[in-house]
Amino acid sequence: MEKVQYITRSALRRASTLEVNPQARQRLQELFVNFCLILICLLLICIIVMLL
């Protein structure tokens, strides 16, 4: 019985991780894009300040 419960739990974990992965990837991509945009903005501000 313990083995069966362990197998079912591991299977459920695998299924849940497979379902969650695309959403997690989208979130990571969005965070990465936002981070890049912020870095670009900071670089632009630094350049403008140096020019002034």
Swiss-Prot record:
Function (record text): Reversibly inhibits the activity of ATP2A2/SERCA2 in cardiac sarcoplasmic reticulum by decreasing the apparent affinity of the ATPase for Ca(2+). Binds preferentially to the ATP-bound E1 conformational form of ATP2A2 which predominates at low Ca(2+) concentrations during the diastolic phase of the cardiac cycle. Inhibits ATP2A2 Ca(2+) affinity by disrupting its allosteric activation by ATP. Modulates the contractility of the heart muscle in response to physiological stimuli via its effects on ATP2A2.
Side Cytoplasmic, residues: 1-31
CDD domains per UniProt: Phospholamban
Name this protein carries in UniProt: Phospholamban
Modified sites of kind N-acetylmethionine: M1
Post-translational changes noted in the entry: Phosphorylated in response to beta-adrenergic stimulation. Phosphorylation by PKA abolishes the inhibition of ATP2A2-mediated calcium uptake.
Oligomeric and partner information: Homopentamer.
Protein's GO biological process: circadian sleep/wake cycle, sleep; locomotor rhythm; negative regulation of calcium ion import into sarcoplasmic reticulum; negative regulation of heart rate; regulation of calcium ion transport; visual learning
Subcellular location: Endoplasmic reticulum membrane; Sarcoplasmic reticulum membrane; Mitochondrion membrane; Membrane
Keyword Acetylation among UniProt keywords: yes
Gene Ontology cellular-component terms listed: membrane; mitochondrial membrane; sarcoplasmic reticulum; sarcoplasmic reticulum membrane
Keyword entries, A-Z: Acetylation, Endoplasmic reticulum, Membrane, Mitochondrion, Phosphoprotein, Sarcoplasmic reticulum, Transmembrane, Transmembrane helix
Residues modified as Phosphothreonine: T17
Expressing tissues: Heart.
The keyword Protein biosynthesis appears for this protein: no
Gene for this chain: PLN
Membrane-spanning intervals of the chain: 32-52
InterPro entries: PLB
Membrane topology: Single-pass membrane protein
Assigned protein family: Belongs to the phospholamban family.
GO molecular function: ATPase inhibitor activity
Residues found modified as Phosphoserine: S16
